[in-house]
Regions:
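Extracytoplasmic/lumenal domain signature
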Residues: 1-9, 39-94, 100-103, 107-166
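Signature of short aromatic-glycine-proline-rich micro-motifs recurring in repeat-based ectodomains
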Residues: 6-22, 98
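A general structural signal for short secondary-structure junctions and capping/turn motifs
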Residues: 14, 22-26, 143, 151
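Short, surface-exposed loop/turn motifs at beta-strand boundaries within globular domains
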Residues: 16-18, 25-27, 68, 80
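Substrate-binding clefts and catalytic carboxylate motifs of secreted carbohydrate-active enzymes
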Residues: 21-24, 28-35, 41-42
Length: 166
């Protein structure tokens, strides 16, 4: 599909689908967890010629006007390819944070509102949310130190770490 002078609508867009964000698989549930951006865009061709030594894009991209975007955490059954559950999020669809699933049956993710959130790995039921007011560009990770488990994420200009209860 080629861009046109009038603009070509494309779904998912350049910033849509599952792009940068880490995914996670939980062998206990058989589910694959992925953050997705349901977002369409318009690609426009610019009638300009390439010249050596000058920047050239050949066109432009904008979010499809009048079409609100939506960030959604999805759990997919790898045996069937069917979506088992979804957690729609509220926000500007600018977060690029991925997901972390744990042996304890939770999925931790960066909600598009800027919060760190957790959902039940089997049902998708929201469990908790902590507003960090940060735009996520990384995925949560877990580690152990001195026999204590931690969850950390780089969000905004900070690295935020939570100690989990024993």
């Amino acid at each position: 599909m080629e861009p046109t002078l009038e603009g070509q609508r494309v779904c998912p867009s350049l910033e849509g689908a599952s792009n940068w964000y880490s995914t996670s698989f939980n062998p206990a549930t058989g589910l694959y967890y992925v953050q997705t951006n349901d977002k369409c865009g318009v690609f426009t061709k610019i009638p300009a010629e390439w010249e050596a030594g000058k920047g050239f894009m050949g066109g432009s991209f904008v979010q499809a006007p009048g079409e609100p975007a939506q960030r959604v955490l999805r759990a997919i059954d790898l045996q069937t390819g069917k979506i088992v559950w979804e957690v729609p999020q509220t926000g500007p669809v600018t977060s690029w944070g991925g997901v972390l699933s744990t042996a304890g049956g939770i999925v931790i993710f960066g909600d598009d509102s800027g919060a760190m959130a957790a959902a039940d790995a089997a049902s998708g039921k929201p469990l908790w949310s902590f507003q960090m007011n940060q735009n996520w560009k990384a995925s949560p990770m877990t580690y152990e130190f001195d026999n204590k488990q931690f969850i950390a994420v780089a969000a905004g200009s900070a690295i935020i770490t939570f100690g989990l209860p024993d």
